[in-house]
């Protein structure tokens, strides 16, 4: 799985406003770290990296056309990008309760003759919530329903930005706020998580 993540950051000593500032800063920093070489900056040192020959340790891949996100919950900020599958790789399993939410979301969208988001279940939002639920419930057994997820994630806020420039469907510049896809919008609402817009 190609993705980029950073270590959790304890912000419990900060005011709520400072915590949200850290949420935004961590997201933008992750987008910059995870971005492939900037095509508009010939001096970007990432141009020297041979992506085909470089082995990236897990969670440090360079990406473009992706999403970086951070989750603020109980005084901790965690950051993660969306994920893409490499040859011979599998996507990580989402926490069972969150996987169930995404299955419900897909059924709901298809029942209305729609299509799930392009990154359904692979977006930064899905990985962030799953990672947090796994920290709270490592065995995947005590948080098992939508109500359990809502209780566990009470007060959580999420912020997401574009990695690299996006041309379609809506033009977005690198580092610009990126709203959740149609699948994640519904999933975050079901989980009781607020999408912070900055």
Residue ranges and their predicted role:
Residues 1-198:
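Zinc-dependent deaminase catalytic domain
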């Amino acid at each position: 799985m190609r993705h980029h993540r950073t270590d959790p950051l304890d912000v419990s000593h900060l005011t709520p406003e400072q915590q949200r500032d850290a949420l935004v800063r961590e997201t933008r920093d992750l987008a910059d770290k995870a971005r492939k070489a900037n095509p508009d900056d010939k001096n970007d040192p990432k141009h020297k990296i041979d992506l085909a020959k470089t082995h990236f340790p897990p969670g440090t891949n360079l990406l473009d056309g992706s999403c970086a996100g951070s989750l603020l919950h109980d005084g901790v900020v965690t950051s993660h990008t969306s994920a893409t599958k490499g040859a011979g790789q599998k996507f990580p399993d989402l926490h069972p309760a969150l996987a169930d939410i995404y299955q419900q979301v897909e059924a709901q969208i298809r029942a209305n003759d729609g299509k799930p988001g392009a990154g359904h279940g692979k977006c930064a939002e899905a990985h962030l919530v799953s990672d947090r639920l796994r920290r709270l419930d490592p065995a995947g057994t005590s948080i098992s329903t939508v109500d359990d997820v809502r209780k566990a994630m009470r007060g959580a806020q999420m912020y997401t930005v574009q990695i690299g420039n996006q041309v379609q469907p809506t033009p977005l510049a690198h580092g610009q706020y990126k709203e959740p896809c149609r699948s994640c919008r519904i999933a975050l609402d079901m989980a009781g998580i607020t999408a912070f817009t900055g």
